[in-house]
Regions:
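N-terminal signal-anchor transmembrane segment
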Residues: 2-94, 115-122, 443-447
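Long extracytoplasmic/lumenal interhelical loops at the membrane interface
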Residues: 212, 216, 338-409
């Protein structure tokens, strides 16, 4: 494996990520600050591939479990809150003269953000909403600028692909290493409950764990099970697409990470992530493969493999359900199926955890049907932050994405958000960004349980990077391959230029 140039480079990137996390743990925020400075320096020196890699590592750092990487010291919030903005603006200044059509179709979201600005003026916390709008806009701007015209920069393209593979490997292998230590997930769950609802929420979480026999939702190395689950689902899809459309053959490191991701996703007990993973198999086989031609024998092996996978999964689920109601326990998230079945139907049990958030979003919509109640804020934020002076940010939990958009931005925002989605899919389809379309659809699917679409300061940033940066990287590699084939047929390079020399492992 290490003789392969790509895997050799990815292993080096993995080692650097491990060293960075270790340094961040013991330097009290100095390492993330240095990462920001390195990213800015790389952007201004023209090494935008390294800059976007630093840009991707910052939100990844935010979501690592506080038991593994405690965020202690004043430098942490400075690096994490303003670091992404600094690197994004550096990329903007350094790439102002580098324009082209090969970029992500993000322009359609601008009208939606403008409508969110209008609605936030009369929302619960206008200052917080405006700061979150700026943060979200700069985050998307950094992704858009950093990935622009990657086909002209094959070395940057390779660096980004290696970093993405190393990040997914770190998350999956690191989470596997946490399986023998359930206390870490236990302590992480209690700490999250304490942060969200104080001592009352922590006591309630503890009682629920006791009732379920001391079991807790598996977090791996992330700060929450609902953070690990969608990341694993999108990592599964990206690794599969990378293996099929870039490597174009079965590769053991890819297969190993894919197989390790599935049982850990089951351990998180995230039903939405399981649906996202199932949707990834469906979309890749019935959409992406039909849009991107691959060898017949590879396609046949994929079909056989998917059939065997579905058959084994169904048989295993049936066996576990017959033996000890394992599937019912997983779907209902309870250890006593009989008692829970007397209170709720299966559909009620599966939607009960999100129903309150959906009802609350509809309450916010009725408060201001036209423009909503403010971008990424809620009424309870105002009560929790009362008397704390100038507040620039506040944590929030939202439910299903469509209802959240309706509650935050009203009818106008919902219509403009639908316009953004339509423009994204139409433009991406015209540009033949088929893997990006697949990954973006899975990003939307992962937001049907706990919406993180507008949360660049949380798990949403990692999902955006895996889905959009990861998908666009693969599409750009395929674009390069089509261009090379076109040049070979014509006997020349387009525009009279010599073809760029592809680096080893590309």
């Amino acid at each position: 494996m290490f003789k392969d140039p790509f895997y050799k480079g990815a292993f080096k990137a993995l080692v650097l990520i491990v060293l960075y996390v270790v340094a961040a743990r013991y330097t009290y925020g100095v390492a993330p600050l240095l990462l920001v400075l390195v990213g800015c320096a790389a952007a201004f020196s023209g090494k935008s591939g390294r800059a976007i890699c630093c840009y991707m590592l910052l939100p990844f750092t935010i979501n690592i479990s506080p038991m593994i990487l405690p965020k202690i010291g004043i430098l942490w919030p400075i690096a994490l809150r303003f670091g992404t903005m600094a690197i994004a603006l550096s990329l903007c200044f350094s790439a102002s003269n580098r324009r082209g059509r090969n970029c992500l179709p993000f322009f359609g979201i601008v009208p939606f953000l403008l409508s969110a600005c209008i609605g936030s003026a009369t929302g619960w916390l206008p200052m917080v909403s405006y700061m979150k709008l700026v943060n979200y806009f700069v985050f998307l701007l950094g992704i858009w600028i950093g990935t622009q015209n990657l086909q002209e920069r094959p070395r940057d393209l390779l660096v980004i692909r290696k970093t993405l593979f190393a990040m997914t490997a770190f998350i999956i292998l690191g989470s596997v290493a946490m399986i023998p230590f359930p206390t870490i997930s236990y302590a992480t769950s209690l700490q999250n409950a304490m942060q969200e609802g104080g001592e009352v929420a922590a006591v309630a979480a503890y009682r629920e764990m006791v009732l379920e026999g001391g079991k807790t939702l598996f977090c791996g190395i992330m700060n929450h099970s609902q953070a690990l689950a969608p990341i694993l689902a999108l990592a599964f899809a990206w690794l599969l697409c990378d293996m099929l459309f870039v490597e174009k053959r079965i590769r053991l490191p890819h297969v190993g990470l894919i197989l390790l991701a599935m049982p850990m996703l089951y351990m998180t007990r995230s039903r939405v992530a399981f649906v996202t993973l199932s949707a990834s198999l469906f979309m890749i086989y019935f959409y992406t493969i039909r849009k991107i031609p691959i060898a017949y024998d590879v396609k046949r092996k994929i079909g056989v493999g998917m059939t065997l996978f579905i058959a084994v999964t169904v048989l295993a689920m049936a066996a576990f359900e017959i033996r000890d109601d394992a599937v019912s326990k997983w779907l209902r998230k309870t250890q006593d199926v009989d008692v829970d079945a007397q209170k709720y139907s299966l559909m009620e049990a599966m939607t009960s955890s999100r129903q309150g958030l959906m009802d609350y979003s509809m309450y916010e919509y009725r408060r201001n049907p036209l423009f909503g109640s403010g971008f990424q804020v809620a009424a309870y934020n105002r009560e929790m932050l009362k008397g704390q002076g100038l507040v620039l940010s506040a944590s929030i939990e939202k439910g299903v994405l469509p209802v959240m958009v309706l509650g935050e931005t009203g009818i106008v925002g919902a219509v403009l958000f639908a316009f953004f989605l339509i423009s994204f899919y139409v433009t991406a389809s015209r540009r033949r960004l088929y893997v990006t379309i697949t990954m973006f659809t899975l990003l939307l699917a992962s937001n049907m349980g706990e919406a993180s679409f507008f949360s660049p300061g949380g798990i949403g940033s990692v999902l955006w990077i895996l889905a959009v940066c990861g998908g666009f990287t693969i599409d750009t590699i395929l674009l390069n391959e089509r261009t090379v084939r076109f040049s070979a047929l014509r006997g020349e390079w387009p525009c009279g230029r010599l073809p760029p020399r592809a680096p080893k492992g590309f």
